[in-house]
Amino acid sequence: MEKKHIYLFCSAGMSTSLLVSKMRAQAEKYEVPVVIEAFPETLAGEKGQTADVVLLGPQIAYMLPEIQRLLPNKPVEVIDSGLYGKIDGLGVLKAAVAAI
């Protein structure tokens, strides 16, 4: 099975990097074939082109319409703030896979 690409975008990067680490650990544990990467929101239009799903950190939720416009054929969603706040790697991974 080909790996799916889950790309997270945010403004700061620190908490998203931690979330990516937790998501990767859960993907490995449950053998979910994904590649998970984090980028600054300024690269959404460029990097998002190769993603299977694009997730935005809650702090840039206001950018959702703009990024959906840049990536009209991609699922683009805002990460649930509760899952993001708890750095719930499994919860965010499940939501990402469901969106693909």
Kindly give the residue locations of the regions a language model identified.
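Short acidic active-site motifs
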Residues: 42-44, 63, 88
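Alpha-helix C-terminal capping/helix-to-coil transition sites in glycosyltransferase folds
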Residues: 49-50
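Structural signal for conserved beta-strand scaffold positions within catalytic alpha/beta enzyme cores
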Residues: 38, 56, 78-80
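Conserved hydrophobic residues forming the short capping helix/wall of the S-adenosyl-L-methionine
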Residues: 27, 68-71
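Conserved active-site segments centered on acidic
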Residues: 2-43
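Short, surface-exposed alpha-helical segments at coil->helix boundaries
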Residues: 17-20, 61-65
